[in-house]
């Protein structure tokens, strides 16, 4: 059924249909009786899927990745739609419009998206107000980025301001230094640049702090960031963001679309490689959140047994529809029982042991 609906959706420009569908999801879940009925059908209720991470109970491991709900206006909806948590943002200390449109594109032959949104958001202060006013049935993480006009030498203060405003309201914070759509942002992934940023954020909040990294980093850089995260006492790493690589794409005319990051199956292989490398490096000293190209329960299971405590998806939701999260949750529960695990935490990293 969703395949036919998706065909209709894909006749509309991507950013416009995102706005319409997102508004529809929010409206449909505003009334508590409707939200409860949806949650009974879609939410992860099976106790085998639940785990405690950062001292917070997550009813299921699959969360909505940052980028879908940038300003936290849909936090009431995500639990009822099957997600065990959601990460809002990316938000910046100052409001900004992002890059000019068009800035979001479909790559249908690859079941992928290309975006160069540029951290369009209403600012950390507005998100803080929104989170104060709105309740959620599931944990809400917040992804923070650098304001575009802030020079790199003042990046630490910029991130720290967002952490100050949002830390008390978030289950966890993610420092995003890996989007390809803000000029110079990925340069902040070098250990020399990253150390003062992470230190400033950690000094500003007691909320668990993670860093989100790019799939395009060299293996040595991944190792250095992992070591820095352990040294500074970060809670974990989110791996990975979108890729700038165009290798192996089946959709014609991608180069004509211009720059941007690609999400979905084209990043899956590298995201899994990075996850495995990180787990081999840090083991259970850091929480690893795996994102990038997760489409099926098999994909999700492979990430769990490779070391991910939590998972995220966005592009899979776009292509998979409203039952996508439920299907993955049901598949994970079946695999956990089939392999003799009594809970999700037992399976994390089991393929590496």
Curated annotation (Swiss-Prot):
GO terms for cellular component: cytoplasm; plasma membrane. It is a peripheral membrane protein. The active site is at residue 179. It comes from the Bacteria. It catalyses: (S)-dihydroorotate + a quinone = orotate + a quinol. SUPFAM superfamilies: FMN-linked oxidoreductases. PROSITE patterns: DHODEHASE_1, DHODEHASE_2. Its EC number is 1.3.5.2. One of its GO terms (biological process) is 'de novo' pyrimidine nucleobase biosynthetic process. It is found in: Cell membrane. Binds 1 FMN per subunit. Its main location: membrane. InterPro entries: Aldolase_TIM, DHO_dehydrogenase, Dihydroorotate_DH_1_2, Dihydroorotate_DH_2, Dihydroorotate_DH_cat, Dihydroorotate_DH_CS. Its cofactor is FMN. GO terms for molecular function: dihydroorotate dehydrogenase (quinone) activity. Pathway: Pyrimidine metabolism; UMP biosynthesis via de novo pathway; orotate from (S)-dihydroorotate (quinone route): step 1/1. Keywords: Cell membrane, Flavoprotein, FMN, Membrane, Oxidoreductase, Pyrimidine biosynthesis. Substrate binds at residues 70, 115-119, 176, 181, 241-242. FMN binds at residues 66-70, 90, 143, 176, 212, 240, 264, 293, 314-315. Belongs to the dihydroorotate dehydrogenase family. Type 2 subfamily. PANTHER family: DIHYDROOROTATE DEHYDROGENASE (QUINONE), MITOCHONDRIAL, DIHYDROOROTATE DEHYDROGENASE (QUINONE), MITOCHONDRIAL-RELATED. Monomer. Catalyzes the conversion of dihydroorotate to orotate with quinone as electron acceptor. This is Dihydroorotate dehydrogenase (quinone). It comes from Mycolicibacterium vanbaalenii (strain DSM 7251 / JCM 13017 / BCRC 16820 / KCTC 9966 / NRRL B-24157 / PYR-1) (Mycobacterium vanbaalenii).
